[in-house]
Amino acid sequence: MNIEKSNGKSLMTKINNLAKELGIENPQGVTIVRLEDTEDPNKKTLELVQGSWESKAPWFVIDKEEKVHVLSTLESILHLIRSLNEAKYENFNLKLEKAILENLPIDFNDVWVVAMSEIQKRLTESKNKNLLDIDIKKLVKDIKKHHPNLFMQLKDLQFPPQGHQ
């Protein structure tokens, strides 16, 4: 079966690249199947193009329009979703950390505790429970406004007077 089509780029090359992006160690050995129509509109057949029916790695399915789909186990998909959620949460924390540090906290941990408390308060009061919808920079500015004692003020820092070097 020839699967060397798809807009001048070989489907095999495309599938190998997708497999690499998915972290599959041996992309040349992945299972590839072609989805074929049958006379019965309620049934389709799968033709093994490469690999094995017993493969536990994601399968690549080529439809009649030469589009490539990935067939995977529910456990793998749930693991992927959990990983993405962890990455989003970590990214949120890094952005919060950066926003706090940009505002010159006297004690970072004190500001962090106030920020977490304010985030929980906002999430419980909001209909939208999405952590990512919180404007982090505005949150820290609000904390600085309501708790100025937690941050250094540039005017309070002693710099040598101008003209003396």
From Swiss-Prot:
It comes from the Bacteria. InterPro entries: UPF0763. Belongs to the UPF0763 family. This is UPF0763 protein NIS_0363. It comes from Nitratiruptor sp. (strain SB155-2).
